[in-house]
């Protein structure tokens, strides 16, 4: 086995964790049953989806826990939270126990917290073991979170295709089994080692092959999912998906074997000479202390160069608009930000708004997808739509690696890619407002999945680049506190519009206490228009963030080129 192979085992372990712990994607698959068992309104159901997202508010606790406990202990803490949250919900929906609404709300909160903890563990592992290619490792690992709904649907159909409540049982048990499987590589993590230029090129080839295999996996699930309604066929497709996931473990060994050694030559693959990492990829084989000293010197020198290079630009940007717009902008990438520094950064709050009105909107849409399809008369298509969203989210997350593969030929800031990714979401909401056909619903779901998936994956790398890689476990969890806020506000808006248009709904407060059913385009038409306007705010915020950070990225491109 080649040198450094153990780090690839750790990466594949994070991929498996992500693939089987994205349990928030299948909420729409059992939300109607949960609503029926609890006899609650759409507004109250929305609060339960918000509770799941509110778990992300406590994601920073995982980052703090990692400072005091071994990683494997934190992993099983996350597993226990999921087992507790989803396990009791499963018993409730099976009507084996009876719980008040408030306790169900707390269970959803605990279950959502487990998802965020799993994600944080994967972020830390990727950044620790791939300092030179952290963006590629993060995007690849995070992308597989998008196939969770498809995998859970296959597992459920392989057992029985008629019981939607099975999803809750799987949500509780499967992450526990996966955590047990990946325990060994996590316990035997290799010590991070400085990377030579040759090793970086070799790693780049492995990442390229892993991304190709990931693309094949996504296409496999997307095109064969429609055949999985039959239990026997679902089992065959599930075995094929399992084979592709296991193949990820052996692919790095195959690529780096002697028979394939010629492929690591720069003459064969010029792309392998690309500097995939935006932060100090040229740091070579010195000690960690030397690396930190070099990075510190580069940051200081780059800031001086920035001041000189910007002098001519400032002359042309004397107008009041630019003076306000560029106030306190970031001057260099990779600088570590404490929580206090983060709170005083304009760039962080612009970034926060861009995420709140961009990626979070896609998550709220997925939470409401079950009710949306039901109201439009496509209730039988709910599972297909959930899987379509999940799979397209996977492709979107996978596309987040494109800037790293293209940055040798296309020097474009990652925040610019982030802004461009929000555009399809706005188009999708316009399309939903125009027509309620199943074709439009599918196309819009795919666009929103692609858009939100890219945002989710790119955001981790952007947080690392703008506010420091060593602080990402805490800083990114602070960023995603926008998710429960957006989920509450946008979901509340959708629920109020839904219940107010329900058949037989009265104008008094009775509609808040009784289960309602709304059918027709009127149920979500106004909501789609509001969501479209909000996504435009996210788009504008994203372009403002790009405008403020583009010089820091371009200066960094120039430094890496030299």
What are these regions (language model features)?
Residues 47-67, 84-85, 91, 150, ...:
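Central cavity-lining transmembrane alpha-helices of secondary-active solute carriers
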Residues 186-344, 350, 552-562:
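Long, low-complexity inter-transmembrane loops of multi-pass membrane transporters
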Residues 34-35, 65-67, 155-161, 224-227, ...:
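Interfacial helix-cap and linker-helix signal at transmembrane-aqueous boundaries
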Residues 27-30, 34, 115-142, 152-153, ...:
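Intracellular juxtamembrane helix-capping segments at the cytosolic ends
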Residues 55-56, 130-184, 198-224, 392-395, ...:
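Glycine-rich segments within core transmembrane alpha-helices of 12-TM secondary carriers
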Residues 73-88, 414-430:
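Structural signature of the two symmetry-related core transmembrane helices
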Residues 85, 98-117, 440-454:
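Hydrophobic core of transmembrane alpha-helices in multi-pass small-molecule transporters
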Residues 24-34, 220-233, 332-334, 338-395, ...:
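Extracytoplasmic gate region of multi-pass secondary transporters
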């Amino acid at each position: 086995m080649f040198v450094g192979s153990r780090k690839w085992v750790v990466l594949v372990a994070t991929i498996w964790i992500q693939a089987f712990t994205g349990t928030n994607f299948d909420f729409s698959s059992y939300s109607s049953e949960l609503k029926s068992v609890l006899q609650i309104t759409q507004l109250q159901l929305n609060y339960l989806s918000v509770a799941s997202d509110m778990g992300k508010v406590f994601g920073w606790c995982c980052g703090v826990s990692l400072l005091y406990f071994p990683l494997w202990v934190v992993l099983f803490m996350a597993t226990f939270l999921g087992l507790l949250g989803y396990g009791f919900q499963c018993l409730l929906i099976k009507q084996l126990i009876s719980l008040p609404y408030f306790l169900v709300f707390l269970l959803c909160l605990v279950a959502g917290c487990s998802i965020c903890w799993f994600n944080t563990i994967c972020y830390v592992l990727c950044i620790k073991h791939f300092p030179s290619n952290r963006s590629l490792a993060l995007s690849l690992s995070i992308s597989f979170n998008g196939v969770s709904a498809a995998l859970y649907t296959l597992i459920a159909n392989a057992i029985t295709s008629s019981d939607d409540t099975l999803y809750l049982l799987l949500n509780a048990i499967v992450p526990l089994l996966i955590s047990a499987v990946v325990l060994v590589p996590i316990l035997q993590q290799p010590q991070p080692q400085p990377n030579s230029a040759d090793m970086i090129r070799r790693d780049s080839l492995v990442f390229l092959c892993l991304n190709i295999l990931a693309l094949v996996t996504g296409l496999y699930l997307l095109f064969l999912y429609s055949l999985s309604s039959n239990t026997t066929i679902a089992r065959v497709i599930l075995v094929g998906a399992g084979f592709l996931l296991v193949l990820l473990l052996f692919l790095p060994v195959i690529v780096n074997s002697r028979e394939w050694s010629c492929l690591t030559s720069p003459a064969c693959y010029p792309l392998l000479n690309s500097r995939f990492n935006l932060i100090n990829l040229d740091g070579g084989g010195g000690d960690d202390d030397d690396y930190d000293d070099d990075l510190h010197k580069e940051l200081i020198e780059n800031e001086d160069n920035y001041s000189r290079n910007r002098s001519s630009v400032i002359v042309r940007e004397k107008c009041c608009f630019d003076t306000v717009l560029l106030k306190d902008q970031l001057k260099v990438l990779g600088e570590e930000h404490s929580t206090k520094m983060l709170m005083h950064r304009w760039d962080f709050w612009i970034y926060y708004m861009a995420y709140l009105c961009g990626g979070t909107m896609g998550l709220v849409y997925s939470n409401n997808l079950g009710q949306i399809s039901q109201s439009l008369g496509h209730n039988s298509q709910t599972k297909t739509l959930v899987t379509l969203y999940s799979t397209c989210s996977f492709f979107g997350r996978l596309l987040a690696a494109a800037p790293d593969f293209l940055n040798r030929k296309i020097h474009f800031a990652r925040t610019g890619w982030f802004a461009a990714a929000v555009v399809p979401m706005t188009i999708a909401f316009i399309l939903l407002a125009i027509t309620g056909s199943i074709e439009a619903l599918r196309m819009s779901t795919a666009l929103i999945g692609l858009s939100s998936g890219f945002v989710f994956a790119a955001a981790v790398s952007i947080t690392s680049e703008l506010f420091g890689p060593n602080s990402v476990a805490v800083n990114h969890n602070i960023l995603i506190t926008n998710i429960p806020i957006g989920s509450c506000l946008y979901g509340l808006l959708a629920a109020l519009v839904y219940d107010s248009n329900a058949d037989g709904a009265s104008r008094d407060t009775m509609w808040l206490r009784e289960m309602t059913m709304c059918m027709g385009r009127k149920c979500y038409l106004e909501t789609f228009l509001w969501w479209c306007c909000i996504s435009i705010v996210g788009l504008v915020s994203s372009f403002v963030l790009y405008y403020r950070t583009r010089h820091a990225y371009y200066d960094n491109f120039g430094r890496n080129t030299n």
